[in-house]
Amino acid sequence: VQGDIFPLEKGVIMRAIWKRELQAYFLTPTGYVFMGVFLLLSSVMFYLQIMQARSSDLPTFVGQMSYLWMLLSPVLTMRLLAEERQRRTDQLLLTSPVSLSGMVLGKYAAAYTVMAATVVLTLGFVAVVAVYGRVYPAEMAVAYLGFILQGGAFLALDLFISGCAKNQVTAAVFAFGANFVLW
């Protein structure tokens, strides 16, 4: 029988990596800066595209908000693996009982959690439009699903680049370039 002898223990370790990375996002300014800048820019876009134009075309707005993923996802991922290599703590992680894929998935899950929390905060825009206009729930669900999946794709690409880069700045620059090419 092939497979892991202790799969549950590895899941616990992966969860510990997720928790550690999530704490790192909010014990340092990174998570707050990402969320704040994303919400500031999306609020400006909301004001200009929806409020000022007196429009209720939220799916188009959500689609255009996707540009922010391209610009800001490198902020979330630049430190995930490049910092481990720079601080030389990557060897400690690589010799831990968790697999390489478990380590990467734990880090990805933490970045995805921060991104998902940011997306939840943008639902306030939908509430504002619902008060003054008409919102089609199925249309919004599909728009937000695409928005979240696109953000996840950018995070995955940027995490890969962070794993290839020697430092955080290089990871961010190449991730931004790759996002631009992917877009």
Feature annotation, model-predicted:
Residues 9-31:
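Aromatic- and glycine-rich beta-strand/loop motifs that create alpha-glucan
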Residues 18, 36-39, 73, 108, ...:
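Residue-level signature of the transmembrane alpha-helical core
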Residues 20, 24, 83, 95, ...:
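Transmembrane helix-loop junction
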Residues 29-49, 64-74, 177-181:
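Hydrophobic alpha-helical transmembrane segments of multi-pass membrane transport/permease proteins
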Residues 45-47, 58, 110-170:
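Secretory targeting signals
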Residues 61-83, 118:
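Long, hydrophobic alpha-helical segments
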Residues 80-110:
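Helix-loop-helix units of permease transmembrane domains in multi-pass membrane transporters
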